[in-house]
Amino acid sequence: MFLVRDVMYCKPGKVRAMTEKFLAMNKIGERSGMPKMRVMTDLCAERYWTVVAEMEVPDLTAWQQMMSNPPGSEADMKEFEKIMKDYHDLVDTGKREIYKIEG
């Protein structure tokens, strides 16, 4: 089992908007069979205005397949695109972390 974590360092005042995007994506993702995503905001972190979204996947092959060919209908994919439109305006930078869950 692996934990895939996307860390977004938002621009000042943009955390709520980015959080809402991740929460909306999670609803669609769960409906279409993707793993449930945990969405977190910082109280104290490496940088202010941090949003973290993470999910557990059984293996990296499954995650890679999910990223290259997401489950769900064409309408779901269009809704994903609509939700994430202009998200770059909310974010300074970000990173992805992948961890093997040992126990």
Residue locations for each model-derived region?
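Short coil/turn motifs at secondary-structure junctions
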Residues: K11-G13, C44, P58-L60
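Residue-level preference for beta-strand/loop junctions
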Residues: F2, R47-W49
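Active-site-flanking beta-strand signature of metal-NTP-handling nucleotidyl enzymes
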Residues: L3-M8
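Absolute protein N-terminus
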Residues: M1-F2, G103
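A general secondary-structure junction signal
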Residues: T41-L43, I98-E102
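A short beta-turn/loop motif at secondary-structure boundaries
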Residues: T41-R47, Y87
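Short, surface-exposed ligand-recognition loops at beta-strand->loop->(often short) alpha-helix junctions
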Residues: Y9-E20
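An amphipathic, aromatic/His-enriched active-site/gating alpha helix that lines ligand/cofactor pockets
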Residues: E20-R38, E54-I98
